[in-house]
């Protein structure tokens, strides 16, 4: 793997009773961002972190927090997560009719903006907002739970986003989230991913072993 990328481990796969120690662990094992999956039990069938959790963790690490809002009403949560210390706020195009309004509201608070799409949503759904976002998060599993296998054909969206970025002069980063392991990481990078979100494979050690082997040239 010669192509560089940003590693953003997901705290969804960490021990929820020891998140502060998980941050230390991330820093010690090459993480560049912290990915925080916020779930409301409505947009996805799970409940996870709220803004108070981010507020408590913010002082525990220098790493940027990449907050992924998997919620039905993202606009209601923006101010809380801005105040809590989010560096990126990513919401789903499927959850927000007034996407331009929300993008500009987030940017106006000095936070970088991401837009995400689930596996069943085509890249074309993002065409009107791509000029205004800093990050596009391509879900390669149906969101809600860690440890799922990648839906491989979703990587074609990454390639399409790379092509659109080049042809239209956009500057967004492309993140891939879902089913990243030793087998699928090279595939995601070959497709053009700039940011890799990994949960289970990172915390289990399998992905870290691959990264260490690659960096050593073994």
UniProtKB/Swiss-Prot annotation:
Cofactor binding description: Binds 1 divalent metal cation per subunit.
Matching Pfam families: Ribul_P_3_epim
E.C. number: 5.1.3.1
Sequence positions that bind a divalent metal cation: 35, 37, 68, 177
A GO term, aspect molecular function: D-ribulose-phosphate 3-epimerase activity
EC supergroup of this enzyme: isomerase
Top-level taxon in the UniProt lineage: Bacteria
Chain positions recorded as substrate binding sites: 10, 68, 144-147, 177-179, 199-200
InterPro entries reported for this sequence: Aldolase_TIM, Ribul_P_3_epim, Ribul_P_3_epim-like, RibuloseP-bd_barrel
Active site (UniProt): 37, 177
UniProt entry keywords in alphabetical sequence: Carbohydrate metabolism, Isomerase, Metal-binding
Cofactor: a divalent metal cation
Pathway in which this enzyme or protein is active: Carbohydrate degradation
GO biological process: pentose catabolic process; pentose-phosphate shunt
Catalysed reaction, written as an equation: D-ribulose 5-phosphate = D-xylulose 5-phosphate
Family as reported in the entry's similarity comment: Belongs to the ribulose-phosphate 3-epimerase family.
Physiological role: Catalyzes the reversible epimerization of D-ribulose 5-phosphate to D-xylulose 5-phosphate.
Protein name from the UniProt record: Ribulose-phosphate 3-epimerase
């Amino acid at each position: 793997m010669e192509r560089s990328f940003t590693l953003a481990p997901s705290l969804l796969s960490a021990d929820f009773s020891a998140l502060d120690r998980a941050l230390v662990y991330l820093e010690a094992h090459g993480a560049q961002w912290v990915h925080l999956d916020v779930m409301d039990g409505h947009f996805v069938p799970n409940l996870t972190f709220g803004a108070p959790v981010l507020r408590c963790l913010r002082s525990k690490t220098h790493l940027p927090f990449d907050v992924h809002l998997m919620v039905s009403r993202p606009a209601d949560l923006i101010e809380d997560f801005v105040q809590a210390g989010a560096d990126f706020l990513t919401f789903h195009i499927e959850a927000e009719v007034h996407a331009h309004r929300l993008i500009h509201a987030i940017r106006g608070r000095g936070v970088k903006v991401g837009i995400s799409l689930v596996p069943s949503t085509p890249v074309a759904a993002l065409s009107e907002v791509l000029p205004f976002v800093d990050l596009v998060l391509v879900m390669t599993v149906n969101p809600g739970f860690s440890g799922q296998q990648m839906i491989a054909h979703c990587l074609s969206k990454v390639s399409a986003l790379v092509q659109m970025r080049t042809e239209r002069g956009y500057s967004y980063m492309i993140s891939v989230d879902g089913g990243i392991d030793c087998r699928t990481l090279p595939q995601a990078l070959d497709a053009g991913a700039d940011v890799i979100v990994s949960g289970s494979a990172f915390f289990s050690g399998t992905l870290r072993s691959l990264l260490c082997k690659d960096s050593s040239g073994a």
